[in-house]
Amino acid sequence: MKRINYLAIAVLSALLMWSVSDFTELRPNPAQAGAPTEIRGVWLTNVDSSVLFSDQAVTATLQQLADRHFNTVYPAVWSWGYTLYPSQVAEQAMGYQQGLYPDLEEQGRNEALEAAQGDRDLLLGLVAQAHERHLSVIPWFEFGFMLPANAPLAQRHPDWLTQKQGALPVARRYQEGRHPRVWLNPFHPEVQAFILDLIAELMANYDVDGLQFDDHFALPVAFGYDPYTINLYRQAHGGQSPSTNPYDAEWTRWRAAQITDFLDSVFRVVKAQRPNAVLSVAPNPAAFAYRESLQDWPRWREMGYIEELIVQVYRDSVDNFRNTLRDRTIQQAQGHIPTGVGILTGLKNQPVPIGLIQQQVQVARDMGFAGVSFFFYDTVWTVANGETWRDRDRAIQQLFAQPRERSQL
């Protein structure tokens, strides 16, 4: 496909302006000294939520968050196989500039709803309104390398997909929730170029404060058995094929290292376009992330690629929550970069009691973490049994009684 020159410009600029060693020096976390700071974030998604579907909803959402002394929003900008902003890169790759509504049913893309958006640029308006309210905006690549199985990108570029062992098409399928998914191959140069071009375009066109990946900037350990990746592995191992055991130590190490190498390119592109932008990662705890998703985020931190870490600690008891935060890799990160805690405030039809949320925030504070982020916006105010909306709102106001600047490097 015809390529936009965002990536070439970004990488050239990065090579001229930085070496990675400039960023890898271990630095103390400034959240531990000086004026009080705290990450007070919330994820904004287009799944089970309508907050991104109109300018009026965006305005009301941001005003509510600012009034309650939040300081950071993580809006989804890459979800369900589409960008949530007009993208030339996406249009060239899949034929669509953007897609705000997830393809939740078998009929696929809802063209009527998308057409009703007209020429609206969600992200442009959101960034402007957030900054007016002193909210930082760190766009969130929610789906990472994951796509719905029926996504236009997957249909147009089947060679970009990786697979498990077995016969196609079943070997490409991955079930998360009730919707079948597929995975872009993070080791394929055309996939990497597509993702880097999206990032360069985003950083060049929007006054954002950073970029965030989560547990989907990864690959389920069962994947990687496509012909391209097998041949790549053989080239690096004297003709030897990867183990049929997906958990094999060398096979796991090699795939994780390739993802780490790609994050180096991501970091350079971000910094070339927007030097002060924060590269944020919101993974699962390290042992699980590496074993099941080939994410070696402690290594990413050591290499200086991560400038903010929000570990997803979605636990239904305070003791489990506290014990997870005692993990050595989390403690090491806490002493190096702003490290916050992702707290689950609820899922669709599964509200989390506000008392548990309050306790978890307090544990994170007592243990010296740089802040918290709630998943996700709508459920912050979704009542659990025995609660009222006013109960939850009052609790949030008490948690964030005074405004705070974000913790940052």
Residue locations for each model-derived region?
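An active-site-proximal structural segment forming one wall of the substrate-binding cleft
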Residues: 63-70, 126-130, 160, 183-218
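Substrate-binding cleft of secreted/luminal carbohydrate-active enzymes
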Residues: 306-321, 328, 335-409
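Aromatic- and acidic-residue-enriched segments that line the glycan-binding/catalytic groove
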Residues: 85-99, 145-176, 215-243
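Catalytic domains of carbohydrate-active enzymes, especially glycoside hydrolases
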Residues: 57-83, 205-210, 305-306, 366-371
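Glycine-rich, aromatic-flanked loop segments that form ligand/cofactor-binding clefts
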Residues: 70-80, 120-174, 212-215
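Active-site-adjacent "subsite" loops/lids of carbohydrate-active enzymes
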Residues: 36-44, 49-52, 121, 144-205
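Glycoside hydrolase catalytic-domain groove-lining segments
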Residues: 234-350
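Aromatic-lined carbohydrate-binding/catalytic grooves of carbohydrate-active enzymes
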Residues: 70-118
